[in-house]
Design a protein with these regions (language model features):
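Tandem repeat scaffolds
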Residues: 1-148
Length: 148
């Protein structure tokens, strides 16, 4: 387990991540096209990181993404026990949350052009000041969701 570390400008996109990260900060790191499996992040923060076309298959608990590029990121197979996610001022164009269970997720000031939330459980999530142009919510549980 990696704890209480800060990673700056690390290129992870060709690495094989297989670890648990607790209370870590990632600044301007590149995770593009990475399949993030067998890796859990808890109480971590990602700032200005690149997750273009990354695929999340591990667990994310109490994780914040700020000013990240997440174009085409895939959360479809994210661990079902992931929770406490916050996305702020991030680009999530074409991101897929199909069938993901991410209740109480917070999206603030995010650009989400043509994002896919089909059949996802996004109950009690917040979409505050987000650009939701052409986003698909077919079959999505949006009970008590806030679209302020």
């Amino acid at each position: 387990m990696t704890e209480n570390e800060t990673f700056e400008k690390v290129d992870f996109h060709e690495m094989e991540l297989d670890d648990e990260y607790y209370d870590c900060v990632f600044v301007a790191c590149d995770f593009s096209k990475l399949v993030i499996r067998n890796t859990d992040f808890e109480k971590c923060e990602f700032r200005a990181c690149n997750f273009t076309l990354a695929s999340f298959k591990g667990a994310l608990r109490d994780v914040a993404f700020a000013d990240c590029k997440m174009t085409g990121a895939d959360f479809t197979d994210i661990d079902r026990f992931s929770d406490g996610l916050v996305f702020e001022n991030s680009h999530l164009d074409y991101a897929s949350f199909v069938e993901a269970r991410l209740r109480k997720t917070v999206f603030r000031g995010c650009k989400m052009y043509e994002g896919y939330f089909n059949d996802a459980d996004m109950a009690e999530s917040v979409f505050d000041r987000c650009d939701l142009e052409r986003v698909s919510f077919v079959g999505t549980n949006l009970e008590k969701a806030d679209f302020s």
